[in-house]
């Protein structure tokens, strides 16, 4: 009996240790100072994170974590100042980037480039001001802040960002904004350019002095999902604003341009709401399968109630789209 009790106790202790490790949070710190940066990686995660560029201010980190082998989500805390540096990150697992009083400029490319298709949380530490800027054009970069994954901006601090050659903020997937303050102070192209959808629920977003659109939302794939519950895995090309304050001024294009719909359900719209463009490309009419018109999951009608063929090239006008039990308006311009 005593042997059984000891064995059981050992198993329970092992399980508790494993559970504690799965919930433990590890932080990698990156402190910029001119042309150098000190990267500190905790020993416990040294097998998952590699510093590829030594003490250079052009920081390049590789995270080998995967969905099945990982120490939990890792936080990357960035602070300090460099007029000739960058943060280049490659990984395959969700991560958090904490901006903790950072001023970072890269004269050659993006200030921040994240090659990770998972959820990327960008948190501004409370009461901090963080500034990102870029330099000359780089064929691999589409923005001063360039992210491959789902980009969620949050926190109680401020982020200032500008681009001299492309978009200020570029995300290959969706962008969400809450709580934080983001100031786009200039861009050669769009202020924010993203795919899938854009959602602002709180916080403050100010876009000024961009040469193209304030915010542009595209599809990630040619096939739309329509609106999904909680927007998870949504690929609609839609823009949503339910709270916060959005200011857009001094631009060369539309304040907001989407391939889906634009929906304001709350917040303050401090821009010309007539200078917006929402439309669907003809790709929305392409069937997802080989179904005929009667079975097509996307149904499009004109204002006279006439059903449009799924492969039709629509003329300018307003149409009603029915998909997945939902109905929305589509404007062809």
Description of each model-found segment:
Residues 5, 38, 280, 287-288, ...:
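A detector of low-complexity, intrinsically disordered, Ser/Thr/Gly/Pro/Ala-rich segments
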Residues 19-20, 305:
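Bacterial Sec-dependent N-terminal signal peptides
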Residues 20-282:
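A composition-driven surface/loop motif
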Residues 10, 27, 297-299:
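Detector for intrinsically disordered, low-structure N-terminal pre-sequences
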Residues 2-8:
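Sec-dependent signal peptide recognition
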Residues 9-18:
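Hydrophobic h-region of N-terminal signal peptides that target proteins for export
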Residues 285-333:
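C-terminal outer-membrane/trafficking sorting elements
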